[in-house]
Amino acid sequence: MAASLPHPKIVKKHTKKFKRHHSDRYHRVAENWRKQKGIDSVVRRRFRGQISEPTIGYGSNKKTRFMTPSGHKTYLVSNIKDLEVLMMHTKTYAAEIASNVSSKNRVSILARAKALGIKVTNPKGRLALEA
């Protein structure tokens, strides 16, 4: 496996989910975020002690956005042919095997990735354990 290229430190400015106002108070109000539009809304007016709204300031650094902790970006792979794309980019991208790939095909994809020196983010998914 190739080590990733040097990159700035990955900083996640906000890891908690943004919850909808009053979702904790009323069961009928789902937790999925909705922008407050009311003229008197304390959340929209950013009063102290209220929940925070998603804003542009919470965004990640453009260079580290979508990066895994190892420093690679993921590329979805469904078959062995998809791995050929990553041959020249082993320090930047890591393969992620799609969820609809059978366990038989996963074994062959993992073997080919190891031969090419490509990092796989989910190598243990759907593999039968031998007892």
From Swiss-Prot:
One of its GO terms (biological process) is translation. GO terms for molecular function: structural constituent of ribosome. One of its GO terms (cellular component) is cytosolic large ribosomal subunit. SUPFAM superfamilies: Ribosomal protein L32e. Keywords: Ribonucleoprotein, Ribosomal protein. Belongs to the eukaryotic ribosomal protein eL32 family. This is Large ribosomal subunit protein eL32. It comes from Eremothecium gossypii (strain ATCC 10895 / CBS 109.51 / FGSC 9923 / NRRL Y-1056). The gene is RPL32.
